[in-house]
A protein has these predicted regions:
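Extended amphipathic alpha-helical heptad-repeat regions
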Residues: 5-159
Length: 159
């Protein structure tokens, strides 16, 4: 009798252990699904924020008198300063003071244009970051959908 009772007790223990293991597995799968979903939500929010920031910077740059027009003017000024310097440097009997002044003007124009180029590069970087965030958000959303589908197939729906 003892051995039958031990067998039954062992079988019940194994069944209870299996039930607990199944519950833990289901909970783990549910947790994975929720984590993926939360990551997707966060990614989408970050993508929206990055897109808004990039759009704002781009719109500001495109305004009249904005970064794009300033950069265009600075590049024209830089080109004119370069021509004036070269003309002064190539003159016969050119005054060293005139050459020095033209070189100073050229350096100032170049520095102004470089500063504006750096600002424009920052706007382009914001746009690239927003694009990358949108791409990442799309991947995270797909992963979340895949996890949800796996959970529903394995466990017959969401609790």
């Amino acid at each position: 009798m003892g051995s039958i009772q031990n067998s039954i007790t062992g079988a019940l223990g194994a069944a209870a252990g299996a039930a607990v293991a199944i519950k833990h597995t289901k909970d783990s799968d549910f947790s994975k699904m929720n984590s993926a979903d939360n990551s997707a939500i966060i990614s989408r929010n970050q993508a929206r924020a990055a897109t808004a920031e990039a759009n704002e910077a781009t719109n500001e740059a495109k305004k009249d008198g904005g970064l794009i027009s300033q950069l265009s003017e600075a590049e024209v000024t830089e080109g004119e300063a370069k021509k004036a310097f070269e003309k002064a440097a190539n003159r016969k009997n050119g005054s060293p003071i005139t050459i020095l002044n033209k070189m100073t003007e050229l350096k100032a124009a170049k520095k102004a244009a470089d500063t504006l180029r750096d600002k424009y590069k920052a706007v382009e970087d914001l746009q690239a970051r927003a694009t990358e965030q949108r791409r990442y958000a799309a991947k995270a959303t797909q992963i979340a959908l895949d996890e949800k589908t796996k959970y529903e197939k394995r466990w017959g729906g969401i609790r």
